[in-house]
């Protein structure tokens, strides 16, 4: 009788434990399904619902279609892919392939392309033959994502200011890569240097960049340079290797599957959700990792900014900091505790305070755009994509031009 009772208790306990595991993994599966739908897939759903034409080709499909049509002059944008592509090479590349028809991106339903300049940036090549009145540095928001060149911030600023605008923006750049890009390609005399800070990812990008020795050396050695202006043939060859690796990797899909599977087995999303929802009272993950920032990361950022301002001062240039809020900041459906981009908005007061203490010129885009009394989400493709649409980029260019005229 006693043995029977013990067996029954063990059986019940086993059922409870198994049920708990099943419930937890079902919850992880629910969160995975909820968060795995990409912005692209969501945009396509909205486009279909509103009967808006949408080019559903991925960048890989677009590129391979061009290769099939023997259009070898078309290349995908590379930029910082050198940091994530497993190539045994210590080369540094800050742009795309020079003088090429470049596949950019698609957020509004159509693919955008541009003819890269002599150094691989998104400019008319003639900008390099004139005085550099205005120099833009930043990530994809500056690069021109994802609109035609004439509708980008740089394109509209050329139109409004009637000045020569050099766009050194590149997708996925963080603050350190922007600093390096300025030192390699933008250190001209008597320019207006405009640095764009992207609230959604710049601090996280900086924390990743600072770990790369070939990037960190630019901060450690004041006069260090790779003289990339004189190595275009070399960097073009490196960029081509990156493209061949990324777009012909037959094991990429399997690698992504393994990565997602490990994510699932570790209950990553469930642990993250519970940790953030309880403000760390139930601590299943390091909450600092989820925040993506701490006192140290801000100190790194401020140190980099000081060095960048010092570099511009050496060239008798005027430095302007542009604070770009994340789209998620305006989306009421995004929970600040669960979204890293929205969470990063909590850093803003400290950043603005630093700028004011250091007497650094700055433009707060949220403050300026709010004066327009418009629905901010209307400035983003389908109200969900990461970059400003052409109307949003035009407004940003107007704001910057007005600020410059008041200097």
Residue map of PLM features:
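Conserved SGNH/GDSL esterase-like catalytic core that processes O-acyl groups on lipids
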Residues: 134, 143-226
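Short, amphipathic alpha-helical "lid/cap" segments that border enzyme active or binding sites
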Residues: 175, 179, 298, 302, ...
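Hydrophobic membrane-insertion alpha-helices, especially the h-region
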Residues: 11-28
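Histidine-centered active-site loop/cap adjacent to the catalytic His
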Residues: 31-35, 261, 361, 382-407
């Amino acid at each position: 009788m006693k043995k029977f009772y013990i067996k029954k208790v063990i059986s019940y306990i086993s059922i409870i434990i198994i049920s708990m595991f099943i419930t937890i993994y079902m919850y992880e599966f629910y969160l995975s399904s909820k968060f795995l739908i990409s912005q692209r897939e969501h945009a396509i759903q909205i486009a279909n619902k509103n009967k808006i034409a949408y080019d559903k080709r991925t960048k890989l499909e677009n590129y391979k279609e061009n290769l099939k049509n023997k259009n070898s002059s078309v290349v995908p944008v590379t930029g910082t892919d050198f940091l994530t592509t497993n190539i045994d090479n210590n080369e540094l590349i800050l742009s795309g392939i020079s003088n090429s028809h470049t596949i950019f991106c698609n957020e509004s339903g159509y693919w955008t392309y541009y003819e890269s300049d002599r150094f691989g940036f998104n400019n008319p090549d003639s900008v390099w033959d004139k005085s550099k009145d205005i120099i833009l540095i930043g990530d994809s928001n500056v690069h021109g994502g994802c609109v035609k060149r004439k509708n980008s911030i740089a394109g509209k600023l050329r139109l409004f200011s009637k000045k020569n605008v050099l766009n050194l923006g590149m997708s996925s750049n963080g603050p350190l890569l922007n600093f390096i890009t300025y030192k390699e390609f933008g250190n001209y005399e008597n320019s207006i240097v405009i640095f764009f800070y992207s609230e959604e990812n710049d601090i996280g990008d900086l924390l990743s960049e600072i770990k790369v020795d070939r990037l960190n050396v630019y901060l450690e050695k004041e006069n260090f340079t790779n003289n990339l202006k004189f190595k275009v043939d070399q960097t073009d060859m490196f960029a081509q290797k990156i493209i061949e690796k990324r777009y012909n990797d037959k094991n990429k899909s399997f690698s992504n599957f393994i990565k997602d599977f490990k994510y699932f087995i570790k209950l990553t999303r469930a642990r993250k959700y519970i940790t953030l929802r309880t403000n760390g009272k139930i601590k299943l993950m390091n909450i600092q990792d989820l925040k993506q920032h701490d006192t140290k990361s801000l100190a790194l950022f401020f140190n980099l900014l000081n060095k960048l301002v010092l570099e511009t001062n050496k060239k008798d240039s005027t430095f302007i900091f542009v604070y770009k809020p994340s789209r998620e900041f305006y989306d009421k459906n995004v929970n600040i505790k669960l979204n890293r981009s929205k969470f990063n908005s909590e850093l803003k007061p400290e950043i603005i305070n630093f700028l004011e203490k250091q007497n650094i010129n700055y433009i707060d885009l949220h403050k300026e755009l709010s004066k327009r009394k418009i629905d901010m989400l209307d400035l983003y493709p389908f109200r969900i994509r990461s970059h400003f649409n052409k109307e949003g980029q035009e407004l940003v260019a107007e704001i910057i031009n007005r600020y410059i005229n008041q200097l």
